[in-house]
Amino acid sequence: MPAFAIYFLAALAEIAGCFTFWAWLRLGKSGLWLLPGMASLAIFAWLLTMVDTPAAGRAYAAYGGIYIIASLCWLWVAEGARPDRWDMTGAAVALAGSAIILAGPR
């Protein structure tokens, strides 16, 4: 599976898992929300191990840009708040950084 696809799936798993904690602590949802949340966070961590790189730190650094894009998608789709131009500009800069990390000659 291509690194971008793994990173995108990992981002969805992490955001969904973290949102369950947000829902529990900030929105007053049941603590039972944490069960699928913890499973989702475990899937997130497992997915990052699937990236073809010998260095974990590099995998995490490249993942950061993808996470930002996925978070803004979550903001728009799940929370109904449209990202503004500053969100999009920041995401573009972060994505450029991720691309440099992923494409760098090694």
From Swiss-Prot:
Location in or out of the cell: Cell inner membrane
UniProt membrane topology term: Multi-pass membrane protein
Domain of life: Bacteria
Main location: membrane
Gene Ontology CC: plasma membrane
Keywords: Cell inner membrane, Cell membrane, Membrane, Transmembrane, Transmembrane helix
One Pfam family linked to the record: UPF0060
Entry's transmembrane regions: 4-24, 31-51, 61-81
Family from the record: Belongs to the UPF0060 family.
NCBIfam families per record: PRK02237.1 (NF002586)
HAMAP family reported in the protein's UniProt record: UPF0060 (MF_00010)
PANTHER family associated with the record: UPF0060 MEMBRANE PROTEIN YNFA
Protein name: UPF0060 membrane protein Smed_0659
